[in-house]
Amino acid sequence: DRLSHAYLFSGPRGTGKTSTAKILAKSLNCINGPTPEPCNVCANCERINNGSSMDVLEIDAASNRGIDEIRELREAVKFAPVDGRYKVYIIDEVHMLSASAFNAFLKTLEEPPHHAIFILATTEKHKILPTILSRCQIYDFNRITVEDTVEHLSYVARQEGVHFEPEALNVIALKADGGMR
């Protein structure tokens, strides 16, 4: 029942790390929450779904890997949430941050404001500083099995009224290499 201030979601591409981060952000900020299952219809959930929430910020570390961006984050984190209970910072591809950016970010992870939650996502956990890892609750995501991928593709096709050959779904699932994208 205790909430961590920092999570690290690690695993291959397409295994749901960023999607899970957004679901967690909705669970924390849903008007009916905090709840294990966000409603997806309240104003907070809708804003998170369409990317317009002032309380959930997604940062692509592959594009914003420098110390200046992390300094901006350190300043922004001081401000309380606008609509929800928490400000959630989702930092995708966090392993791409420069060493100086990691060190600047460490200070924020060591003394986070009570309203800030950090969700770091990576495909390369081994590139993240041990001092960062030690401050995160770590969740390892695994490749999705071919069977589960076929089952999901079949479900989506039926929902959309699309005819399919089961063998074709199996080929697609094999080519997906454990990712659901």
Residue ranges and their predicted role:
Residues 139, 146-170:
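Helix-loop-helix "sensor" segment of P-loop NTPases
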Residues 1-138, 148, 156:
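P-loop/Walker A NTP-binding region and its immediately flanking N-terminal helices
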Residues 165, 176-181:
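The conserved phosphate-sensing helix
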